[in-house]
Every structure is written in structure tokens, then in C-alpha cells.
């Protein structure tokens, strides 16, 4: 042990010599130090300005562009509502906006092309850009999205965070899924603020994702597996919308027929609960449903579609009348299943409108396959038919299949379109008196648009007294996609809304206390004053710390 101590002492003596000052010598020496006064500019501290307005989140103008389905439009409404509630100004003029929020659709190639072109335009105009929707969710590593912020389809409740960081110059990407105890949720909360594109219509997404794995579909890559919202949350959302003057509800999802299979319930159960809260005269429209899942509930669905507050309308995509093509598509039904659904509903729900979709030129489709599809349309004469020329979507199995030549796809699309336009679905209704619900203005601004019991479009005179009302009209003209009606003299105009609708652009779900200031300058002034106080306190604190440090020397 003594040897070890001697060794340690030798090491210390190598470092500290006998001539070095001792600790008490260092303390005495400090007394002879004269502190040098630091130059301060008190005026500079007090007059220091906060950053420019463009860097203060919550004061900018935002333009939102949405492509695609009702589900995507609902997401866009929710994002607009949250941004407006935070203080951002939502503008319909893209050139005036500081930031573009582009909400994309991946169903068809042309929609993605428009999305990509809009990104380019935004960058050329030196706009901040945030991307959302199915395209960036499904393929976020595309070169044209490099360096841009992305909001995932299940992360729309965090749009304010993403926009805020983007305005500050950062790139943010939130693409994760929402889960509860490991179980995937339907998405963002349904009670979030929103700005309805049409204050009279509430779009409710009842579930996200689906149970199928169609070989041509890119949406599955973005929306994923089925995840349904609880019945009570959907009913609460519907009830709230009626309290805000809504008179029509659209239920939407990638497949409404599959609703509830992941949470132990089903679509009829939800619909019966919803009709309990629908005011008299208000209407509910059911969204797209695939044949396999509605087959199990035909009896109940027929009863619901006969309900006076539910449109006798159903969108059932068939895609092809060839079983071999349906098998290649992995549609999980045969043409006999589709016909069974349609025939049953036509019998049990007199006058029901059946809308459907058809893809022309799917890989492997022969002339005989296509003739089967033509025969189906000829037999049922669908009043609403969405005809789509096949586009291979990158990353889908169908893109790797042997393709039908482009000129053949175009010819088949043209032939089917000609067949569709060869019959008039509404001529027999001329002279009928119908009750219609008026909800919007026509594209040419010449008429108001309404829908009858079967969700058939009826154009009525542009009388402001009709908006949001149930009106009785007499049909005097019929076109391919619409009818025209004249109000019946002395008929009663019914108001289904239980309260005055929100103004266009007004945020849903906000109390008076939580609404943003009407004057953007007041918000800006508050931000400036807060920042000025912050900077002054920070500078004062730094000065105190410096003074204390000097005293301790």
C-alpha cells in the first residue's frame, strides 16, 4: 500500500510544481481584477422587432385543392376547418395564397397528372407546398415530391402542425397509422372542426380502407385494410351536423357495404341508428358498396332504402360482366351475384336508381368479354354509368399483366359510351309531380340543383327561397343526366333544416369563444405583442445572468 501511495504522489508532482500558485493565492489574485464594463444598448433590446409576418404561423392565406372521391373531399373539409380555427385564412384564389395544400387522388392516372402539374405550378410561383391524399401516402418517395411536406390520410388532425413547420421552412412527413391498443382506427376524430364545401351537405366517412385486394386498385396501398368508426361516433357526428343547418348527409368510404366487419357490427345497424336522428325532410345518401358485402343484408337494405328519409339510390360497381375478367380483377364475386343484388332491390324498392362503374380494356379482356358487358348495359339501362378506360397504376398487379392495345381500349370505351347515350332514362317521367330537395347551384349558374326521392337530378328555377328546401315540382323536360321541374303552384315549401345553415366558409363545430378573430390584423397584433414581450424578457434575463456571473468572478 505505501508503494502505491508513493507512486501516486510522484504522478501529482509531475503535474503541479512547487512554484505553482496555491488555491488561496488564486482567490487573493481575483481581488485585484477590475471588471470591464460590457457595452449594452438598452434601446436596441427594447425596440427589437419580431420576425417578419411571413414567419409567424397562423397569419397566412392557404389555398386547398382536392381531387377524387367524397372521402377525399371530406378530408379536405376537415383540414380546412382546422386551419381556419387556428387562424389561417382559407382562400379560393391560388395566386393570393402563401401556401398550397394539394389533396390528391390515386384512382386514375389523369388525376395524378393534374396533382403533379399543380406541384410544379406552386413551385414556379414560389409558394409553400403541403401534399396530402392517397398519392403521397401510397408512394411518398416519388422524385417530384422530394423535399415537400406530406400529411398522411390518417394524420389529417395534425394538418396545423405540418403547415406551421412548412411555413417556417421545414419539410415534415406524417404518414403513420392511428391505433388503439394495437388495433387500427378509422382515422382522425370525427368531431374536428371542418368547413363544408356546401353548408347544406355533410359528408361522413364511416370507415377507411377495404377488405378487397383488387389487382388494378392503388387506393388500397394508401387507405389500407378496413377500419370502421363506432356507430355512436357516427350518429353523434350526424346529429351535430343537423344542429348546424345541414339537410343532406352523404355516407362515404372505399366500400360502405363492408362497414363494421372489423368492430362486430354491420351497415344496416348503423343506418337504422342514423335515421333516428334525421329530421323530417332531410335526406341520407348511401355511398358506394361492392356486391359481396351487401348480398348478406339484402332484406334489411331494401327496408332501409324504402325509408322516406333515405334516397332510394345505390352505387354498386360491376366493372365487367365477364366472370373471367372479374376473376383477374380479384373482385370476389361473379356477374350472377351482381344481378341478384340489382334484381332484388329493383323488385323490393320500386324506382330505385342503381349506379355502376365499368372498366374498358382491362388486361386480358377479349372481344367476347366486352360483348358480355355491352349486353349487361343493354339489359339494365343504368341511368348513371361511370365509364373508365383502363390505366395501369404503378405498383399494382394489373400493371404487370399483358395489356390490351391502346387503340382497342379507346374503341371499347367509345362503343360503351355510345350505347349509354342511346337511351333516355328520364323521358317517361315528364309530367310527374315530385318532391325535390334543393341543395346547390348548377355549374352554369342558371339553375338550382335538386334531387328527388331516387337521387335523380332535377334542375329548378333559381329562386333563393328554394335553397335548402323541399319543393314540389312538375317535370316538364328530360335530358340524359337530368330533368327540369317547375314549382307546383300553391305547393308547400318545406324547410328540413332544424336551424339556420352555417355561412359559406364558416367553421363547423366551434363555439363563439373558440372562433378565430374576424380581423386577421388583430391576430397578427397579438402575435407581435407576444413576441415583443418574449424578446424583451429574454434579453433582460440574459443581462441579469451576465451581471451575476461577473460578481462571482
Swiss-Prot record:
Q: Which cofactor does it need?
A: [4Fe-4S] cluster
The entry marks the following residues as binding [4Fe-4S] cluster 1, namely: 69, 105, 134
| GO MF, one annotated term | 4 iron, 4 sulfur cluster binding
Residue span, TRAM domain: 427-489
Domain annotation Radical SAM core: ranges: 196-427
Annotated MTTase N-terminal domain residues: 60-168
EC number, UniProt record: 2.8.4.5
State any GO CC term: endoplasmic reticulum membrane
SUPFAM superfamilies, per the entry: Radical SAM enzymes (SSF102114)
Main subcellular localization, coarse class?
endoplasmic reticulum
Give the membrane topology: Single-pass membrane protein
Q: Where are the transmembrane segments?
A: 530-550
Cofactor, how bound (note): Binds 2 [4Fe-4S] clusters. One cluster is coordinated with 3 cysteines and an exchangeable S-adenosyl-L-methionine.
- Identify the keywords attached in UniProt to this record, alphabetized: 4Fe-4S, Endoplasmic reticulum, Iron, Iron-sulfur, Membrane, Metal-binding, S-adenosyl-L-methionine, Transferase, Transmembrane, Transmembrane helix, tRNA processing
Q: Which PANTHER family match?
A: RADICAL SAM PROTEINS, THREONYLCARBAMOYLADENOSINE TRNA METHYLTHIOTRANSFERASE
Q: What is this protein called?
A: Threonylcarbamoyladenosine tRNA methylthiotransferase
State the species of origin: Xenopus tropicalis
Amino acid at each position: 500500500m505505501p508503494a502505491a501511495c508513493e507512486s501516486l504522489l510522484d504522478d501529482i508532482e509531475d503535474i503541479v510544481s512547487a512554484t505553482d500558485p496555491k488555491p488561496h493565492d488564486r482567490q487573493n489574485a481575483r481581488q485585484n481584477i477590475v471588471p470591464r464594463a460590457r457595452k449594452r444598448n438598452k434601446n436596441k433590446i427594447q425596440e427589437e422587432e419580431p420576425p417578419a409576418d411571413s414567419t409567424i404561423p397562423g397569419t397566412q392565406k392557404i389555398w386547398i385543392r382536392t381531387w377524387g372521391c367524397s372521402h377525399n373531399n371530406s378530408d379536405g373539409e376537415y383540414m380546412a376547418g382546422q386551419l381556419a380555427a387556428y387562424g389561417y385564412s382559407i382562400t379560393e384564389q391560388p395566386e393570393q395564397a402563401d401556401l398550397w395544400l394539394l389533396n390528391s387522388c390515386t384512382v386514375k392516372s389523369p388525376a395524378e397528372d393534374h396533382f403533379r402539374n399543380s406541384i410544379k405550378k406552386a413551385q414556379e410561383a414560389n409558394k409553400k407546398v403541403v401534399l396530402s391524399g392517397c398519392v403521397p401516402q401510397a408512394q411518398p418517395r416519388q422524385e417530384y415530391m422530394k423535399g415537400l411536406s406530406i400529411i398522411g390520410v390518417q394524420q389529417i388532425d395534425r394538418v396545423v402542425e405540418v403547415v406551421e413547420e412548412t411555413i417556417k421552412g421545414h419539410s415534415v412527413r406524417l404518414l403513420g397509422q392511428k391505433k388503439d391498443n394495437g388495433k387500427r382506427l378509422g382515422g382522425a376524430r370525427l368531431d374536428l372542426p371542418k368547413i363544408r364545401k356546401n353548408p347544406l351537405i355533410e359528408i361522413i366517412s364511416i370507415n377507411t380502407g377495404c377488405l378487397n385486394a383488387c389487382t388494378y386498385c392503388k387506393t388500397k396501398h394508401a387507405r389500407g385494410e378496413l377500419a370502421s368508426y363506432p356507430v355512436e361516433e357516427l350518429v353523434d357526428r350526424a346529429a351535430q351536423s343537423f344542429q348546424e343547418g345541414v339537410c343532406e348527409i352523404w355516407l362515404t368510404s372505399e366500400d360502405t357495404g363492408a362497414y363494421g366487419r372489423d368492430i362486430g357490427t354491420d351497415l344496416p345497424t348503423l343506418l337504422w341508428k342514423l335515421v333516428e336522428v334525421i329530421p323530417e325532410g332531410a335526406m341520407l345518401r348511401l355511398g358506394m358498396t361492392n356486391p359481396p358485402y351487401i348480398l348478406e343484408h339484402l332484406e334489411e337494405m331494401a327496408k332501409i332504402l324504402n325509408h322516406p328519409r333515405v334516397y332510394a339510390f345505390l352505387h354498386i360497381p360491376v366493372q365487367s360482366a365477364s366472370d373471367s375478367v372479374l376473376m383477374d380483377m380479384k373482385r370476389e364475386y361473379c356477374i350472377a351475384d351482381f344481378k341478384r343484388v340489382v334484381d332484388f332491390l329493383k323488385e323490393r324498392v320500386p324506382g330505385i336508381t342503381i349506379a355502376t362503374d365499368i372498366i374498358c380494356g382491362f388486361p386480358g379482356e377479349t372481344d367476347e368479354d366486352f360483348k358480355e358487358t355491352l349486353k349487361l348495359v343493354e339489359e339494365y339501362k343504368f341511368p348513371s354509368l361511370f365509364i373508365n378506360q383502363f390505366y395501369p397504376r404503378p405498383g399494382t398487379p394489373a400493371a404487370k399483366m399483358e395489356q390490351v392495345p391502346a387503340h382497342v381500349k379507346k374503341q371499347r370505351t367509345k362503343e360503351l359510351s355510345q350505347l349509354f347515350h342511346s337511351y333516355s332514362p328520364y323521358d317517361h317521367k315528364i309530367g310527374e309531380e315530385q318532391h325535390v330537395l334543393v341543395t346547390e347551384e348548377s355549374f352554369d349558374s342558371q339553375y338550382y340543383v335538386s334531387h328527388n326521392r331516387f337521387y335523380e337530378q332535377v334542375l329548378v328555377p333559381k329562386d333563393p327561397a328554394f335553397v335548402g328546401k323541399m319543393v314540389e315540382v312538375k317535370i316538364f323536360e328530360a335530358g340524359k343526366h337530368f330533368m327540369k321541374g317547375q314549382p307546383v303552384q300553391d305547393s308547400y315549401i318545406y324547410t328540413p333544416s332544424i336551424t339556420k345553415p352555417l355561412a359559406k366558409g364558416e367553421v363547423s363545430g366551434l363555439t363563439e369563444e373558440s372562433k378565430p378573430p374576424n380581423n386577421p390584423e388583430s391576430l397578427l397584433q397579438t402575435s407581435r405583442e407576444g413576441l415583443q414581450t418574449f424578446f424583451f424578457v429574454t434579453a433582460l434575463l440574459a443581462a441579469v445572468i451576465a451581471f451575476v456571473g461577473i460578481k462571482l468572478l
